[in-house]
Amino acid sequence: GKHNSAPMFMLDLYNAMAVEEGGGPAGQGFSYPYKAVFSTQGPPLASLQDSHFLTDADMVMSFVNLVEHDKEFFHPRYHHREFRFDLSKIPEGEAVTAAEFRIYKDYIRERFDNETFRISVYQVLQEHLGRESDLFLLDSRTLWASEEGWLVFDITATSNHWVVNPRHNLGLQLCVETLDGQSINPK
């Protein structure tokens, strides 16, 4: 569920880093061998580049989505999901060296395996009453319905902007469309 996805990801990340560094914390005062147990099956959580960032970092933080329910859609054929994160827990003076928006994409059984979709992540720049928000495209990916696993989007610049200007933190929007532009509900 929503409230345990970030902690489970952090546990998996810890286990991935511990295994990579030589088997975990057994050499750190534990008298028993450490066996990593991962909560998700799938591709590695940390890429080689992520591992370099993590090795140099003195802190890793995870944030859960604060949006409980998506707003009613103004345009009945435009579907999206909203995500908001409270970055006020980042200690003052700390530099954010990397920030990622990670979502897990399930296998879409209701579609043909080779059907392709475009997944786009937008920064919400301004919200309006009675019409769509102003958005800035951060990244998009084209995926098959049969693909499954973590999707990682780099939002370092956006999160740094939000840390410096918290009132501009209006969140992210995720949109899914077919390649011919038909909006799909990203449930």
UniProtKB/Swiss-Prot annotation:
Keyword Glycoprotein among record annotations: yes
Keywords for this protein: Chondrogenesis, Cytokine, Developmental protein, Differentiation, Disulfide bond, Glycoprotein, Growth factor, Osteogenesis, Secreted
Q: Which GO terms describe its biological process?
A: cartilage development; mesenchymal cell differentiation; mesenchyme development; negative regulation of glomerular mesangial cell proliferation; negative regulation of mitotic nuclear division; ossification; positive regulation of brown fat cell differentiation; positive regulation of DNA-templated transcription
Q: Pfam families, from UniProt? A: TGFb_propeptide (PF00688)
Q: Which InterPro entries match?
A: TGF-b_propeptide, TGF-beta-rel
GO MF terms, alphabetically ordered: cytokine activity; growth factor activity
Q: Localized where? A: Secreted
GO CC terms of this entry: extracellular space
Task: Give the similarity note.
Answer: Belongs to the TGF-beta family.
Q: Please describe the quaternary structure of this protein.
A: Homodimer; disulfide-linked. Interacts with SOSTDC1. Interacts with TWSG1. Interacts with FBN1 (via N-terminal domain) and FBN2. Interacts with type I receptor ACVR1. Interacts with type II receptor ACVR2A. Interacts with NOG; this interaction inhibits canonical BMP signaling. Interacts with SCUBE3. Interacts with ERFE; the interaction inhibits BMP-induced transcription of HAMP.
PANTHER family tied to this protein: BONE MORPHOGENETIC PROTEIN 7 (PTHR11848:SF135), TGF-BETA FAMILY (PTHR11848)
What does this chain do? Growth factor of the TGF-beta superfamily that plays important role in various biological processes, including embryogenesis, hematopoiesis, neurogenesis and skeletal morphogenesis. Initiates the canonical BMP signaling cascade by associating with type I receptor ACVR1 and type II receptor ACVR2A. Once all three components are bound together in a complex at the cell surface, ACVR2A phosphorylates and activates ACVR1. In turn, ACVR1 propagates signal by phosphorylating SMAD1/5/8 that travel to the nucleus and act as activators and repressors of transcription of target genes.
The name of this protein is Bone morphogenetic protein 7
